[in-house]
Amino acid sequence: MPYKLKKEKEPPKVAKCTAKPSSSGKDGGGENTEEAQPQPQPQPQPQAQSQPPSSNKRPSNSTPPPTQLSKIKYSGGPQIVKKERRQSSSRFNLSKNRELQKLPALKDSPTQEREELFIQKLRQCCVLFDFVSDPLSDLKFKEVKRAGLNEMVEYITHSRDVVTEAIYPEAVTMFSVNLFRTLPPSSNPTGAEFDPEEDEPTLEAAWPHLQLVYEFFLRFLESPDFQPNIAKKYIDQKFVLALLDLFDSEDPRERDFLKTILHRIYGKFLGLRAYIRRQINHIFYRFIYETEHHNGIAELLEILGSIINGFALPLKEEHKMFLIRVLLPLHKVKSLSVYHPQLAYCVVQFLEKESSLTEPVIVGLLKFWPKTHSPKEVMFLNELEEILDVIEPSEFSKVMEPLFRQLAKCVSSPHFQVAERALYYWNNEYIMSLISDNAARVLPIMFPALYRNSKSHWNKTIHGLIYNALKLFMEMNQKLFDDCTQQYKAEKQKGRFRMKEREEMWQKIEELARLNPQYPMFRAPPPLPPVYSMETETPTAEDIQLLKRTVETEAVQMLKDIKKEKVLLRRKSELPQDVYTIKALEAHKRAEEFLTASQEAL
């Protein structure tokens, strides 16, 4: 049988170090120097949009799925344009003297004067302008600053030996003055809670300047002349903490730059690694247990996905605790859909590195399993299948009973997408090989749910998928299938007998009550109409034979091009869209693409 083929299990690979060691001191613990630069990340295969589960194991050095810039999903109807609104923005301390003098071009100045001119331009770009209350003010000087930033970006990209020791404090100061600021309050602080799946983000009004500042600093970090030994005097813990605070920005373009910059710093400054991980943990703890609101969780998880990929084996206790105490509780937050692909990637990376963590992870997922949120339940099923794709048979035997009890509940779900997603597990060859090896324990758990729903589920598609699962079980072990059928029949008969005994007992109690002289005084009102059970009748022998014939004739052979249902994004109404926001997000160029294009131009 095709599902009998075992998946080739490879030992987890440790990502190679691509960061050049610096003398800034190693982060203790014998951990690999994780890659300093996130590789250009291809568009991922979304979890809920993949082919029917296959047995191909994901390579352990794959990149984490990138965060989507725009989460707005359009329906087929006409787009409703939103009226302009006053744009919120960060709280900048505007410079008093905003009159800038245009300085000579760097390329036209004598070589010996370029360093001093470069410093003058960096200081000139520390002047902050008003983009909110009076966007049309100081247009001439805003253009001078924009042109200066643009020129410095080109200069540091295409020139060599320009990042001298005197440039480091000036570049870090310019970045800090422009970027480290008080973020605006929530878009709608007094009204309904901000919904990241529906509400459009507030874009930063000062982005024309901020974007160039980010681009300059990223090129500064990427420059071949950059020396972490010198930079560590200025890029310290205080700088990193201020950088992490910016991840709560609503503007996804800003978070995209921050993600790349923080990852570069993590790779180049070994002495800051433990501090960065600790501060990210604190952000997650506040998010889980206090605020349940933070805009940058997906980006932080994306960074951690690359970091986890580079952890040395065996894993340190600190890293295991991070998985159990931080990553697993992140599953219970209401806004899980915003960052779930990145979270699932991190979890699977841990299990690929150390299979002994599988049991606590699956037990934790079952603990946080959603009870009333069906789209979230589909996400859990997606992640659980990814975990089963890399699970060791010895670990599977430890968790299969609680795992399949939960799957039986999912198969019985009235929400057809939950039931459908659970039944797709039976098209995964590796999962079927695990089930085949443990059929005596799995089939008795699953059979009642499959049989009951093959007759009672309201959705016809589910019937076909159930028949397919039953057929696979029948082919796997005919005798065990017959035993489960007879056991199910016997259990139903016992249940019916117990129900009859209970009814007879109540009738006796009622008869005794009627003998009481005071019975007319306390007689209950007329009884309610009888409650009819939705359960099917006890299966007869004819039912059993009919089940076998039906399974043989109606089992659906899953086609390879059937796609899983996408994780639902709640679209409560056709909301008006802000055209400016949509165009701005579409025009944004990701930091990885930006760096790749500049390297090709060299």
From Swiss-Prot:
Changing residue 201 to R: In HJS1; decreases binding to subunit PPP2CA; decreases binding to subunit PPP2R1A. The keyword Metal-binding does not apply. A motif (Nuclear localization signal) lies at residues 548-565. Residues 1-96 are annotated as: Disordered. Sequence repeats lie at residues 37-38, 39-40, 41-42, 43-44, 45-46, 47-48, 49-50, 51-52. The modification Phosphothreonine is found at residue 63. One of its GO terms (molecular function) is protein phosphatase regulator activity. Keywords: Cytoplasm, Disease variant, Intellectual disability, Nucleus, Phosphoprotein, Repeat. Induction: By retinoic acid; in neuroblastoma cell lines. GO terms for biological process: meiotic sister chromatid cohesion; nervous system development; signal transduction. PP2A consists of a common heterodimeric core enzyme, composed of a 36 kDa catalytic subunit (subunit C) and a 65 kDa constant regulatory subunit (PR65 or subunit A), that associates with a variety of regulatory subunits. Proteins that associate with the core dimer include three families of regulatory subunits B (the R2/B/PR55/B55, R3/B''/PR72/PR130/PR59 and R5/B'/B56 families), the 48 kDa variable regulatory subunit, viral proteins, and cell signaling molecules. Interacts with the PP2A A subunit PPP2R1A. Interacts with SGO1. Interacts with ADCY8. The B regulatory subunit might modulate substrate selectivity and catalytic activity, and might also direct the localization of the catalytic enzyme to a particular subcellular compartment. This is Serine/threonine-protein phosphatase 2A 56 kDa regulatory subunit delta isoform. It comes from Homo sapiens (Human).
